Every structure is written in C-alpha cells, then in structure tokens.
Amino acid sequence: MQTPQILCPVDHVKMTFTFPKHELNSVIDFIINNVPLPATDKPYSVGTVTPDGRLDMCKQQLGVQGIELVASALKINQIIKHLLLGTNAFGNPGAAAVAGLLSENNTIETVYLGCNYIEQAGCTAICEALEENQSVKSVWFKRNPIGAESMPAIIKLLSKNKRIRTLDLVNTCAGEGFHTLLEYLENNDTIERLYLSGNYLTAPTMKFVSNMLSRNTRLKSLYLSANNIGDEGVAELLPGLMNNTSLEEISLASCGIADAGMELLFTSLKAKKNIKSLDLGYAASTKVLGAKANQLSHASANHLVEYIIEQTNLCNLNLGRISLAETHINILRDEIEKRNGGRLEMNGYQSKHTYTAHQDSKAIKSVYR
C-alpha cells in the first residue's frame, strides 16, 4: 500500500525572506499606488506583473514576512486580478495573511497557493475569508497537506459562495475525506472545474465520483490523473459518466487503466456526445507518485478508433506514451485533425494545433515555472 506524499519541495515554514527587504519596495509601491497594468510583462527585483493582471510571486522565497507585506499592500489594490503565490513556504501563518487580504479585497479573481506547506488551519482561514468574497472565481490549493480535515471548511465555503467555479485539490492527500466533498458536490451548481489528480484515489472512491456525476449538472471539467483507478475504477466510474450530460473534459492520464478498462470505457461511452477533451496519456508526476501508465492493446485500440470516429465533438485527445500501431495512429491523426482546431498527442506525434486552455488555467501561468 502506498504512503501518500505531497509532491512539493517545501516541507517546512520559512518565517522570513532571503533577500534584502528593499528589493520588495518597487513591487509594493506598484501595488499600493494602483499603478495601471503594463503593456508587457514588468519584472521587479521580486515578482512580475503582467498585462492581464497577474501578480506573479511564484518561487520568490517570500516566507511568512514577505507574504504579509504583499498581502497588506494588496488590501487596497484594485488593479491586480490574479494572485500567484506558489512555492513560497509561508504555511499557515502566511495563509492567515492571505485570508486577511481576501476578506477586504474584491478585485482578485484567482488565488493560486500551490506548494506552500499550508495545512488545515491555513486552508480553513482561506475558506472562511472567501465565504463573503465577491470576486474570486478560482482557488488552487494544489500540493499542500490540507488533508481530510479541511473538507468541512471547503464544503462550507462552496455552500455560501456561489461565485467560485474552479477548485483545485491536486495532491492534497485528503483520502476518504474526498468522499464527503463528492457527496456535497452531487447537488452543487457552481463548481465547473474540479481537480483531484495525484491523490492516490482508488476504485472505491470512483463510486463516489460516479454518484456525483450522475446527479451534478454543472461540472464541465474533471481531472483524475495519476490516481490508482485501474480497470476496476473505470467500471465504478462509468455509470456516472453515462448519466452525466454536462461534462466536457475528463483527464484519466496515468491511472493504470489496461485493456478491460479501456474497452469498457470506449464501448460504453460511444453514444455520449458531450465529451470534447479526453486525456489518457502520461502525467508528469507519474513516477514520483508511484502511479501507473495506461495501456492499450491492439484490440482496445480498435475500440478507441471506433469511439473517436463516433465522437465528432471531441477535439482534444491525449495518448502520450501509449504505444499504437501505425494504422491506428494514421486513422486517429486524420480523424482528429480534420476537426476545426483538433489536437492530438501520441507517442512520437503532436499535432500543430493547440487546445485552448480555460481562462482560469491561463490565469495561473507563471513566468517562473
């Protein structure tokens, strides 16, 4: 049995920054004075401001004291829309500072907190601050050890705040705590994009995902990559996928799905026309999380081809690192690329088209990663 681990280089809280304090002054002045956004990316000694309103402070070694200074300045700012704070080691104390900011600022739309050693107390503080917030649309907790104990605070947040549409819980190791969240999401009508990748989820949890999909009519994108789903998990997941009519994107990359699961997936969903993007490829975190790549035999590849031909709305297909026969490669390439903007990624092949990312994903693009 695998021991869940957080895939993050930050394993403790850093109280202060490693650079001279005056290096923060220029970006703090920009924030406090509500300076208009630059025409091109504007790098400072610490951090970068972008034309679309991102304050990118990822990997700037802010620590608790640094994030407190930035958060305090942002309370009165009306220019910054997207706050990127990944990998700054500020933990629960820094999360409390961000919470204080979010309880006052109603301009920020994106809060990216990935990889900061935030635990339950910090997650709860963020959630409580967002309950009455009027502007935030997406919250990214990825790679923080918030655990199962944080699920009640997240559920309470979603029950009160109807503006949040993207929730990222990638590699937060909440285990069976996700079951409670999934039960709540059965009747949620606001979350459109849910990230649960890299959480060591197994077949029993897929039953909860399936139940959620059967009842939820709002969710458009579901990310389950790098989980231990396997063929058994696909069987548990399928009833929900078959009943659901709102889902447009699903990611099952590196979920250890083999022949039986693939055949079941393609044959059962052949009549479904709502899926536009399907990722069965290879997740970057596969090896470090102990996940398993997906496999396609010649027989299941035949079912895949039949499925894709039927799915005329599907315009993004990722089969990265999956071995396919030349005949299957040619058919899939011709089929996907004749679709307007169709994108296909296979072992040794990537189409020239780029699948258009959702605006919430664009908003967390960092110049530092």
Task: Specify the residue positions occupied by each region the protein language model found.
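Leucine-rich tandem repeat or coiled-coil scaffolds
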Residues: 1-369
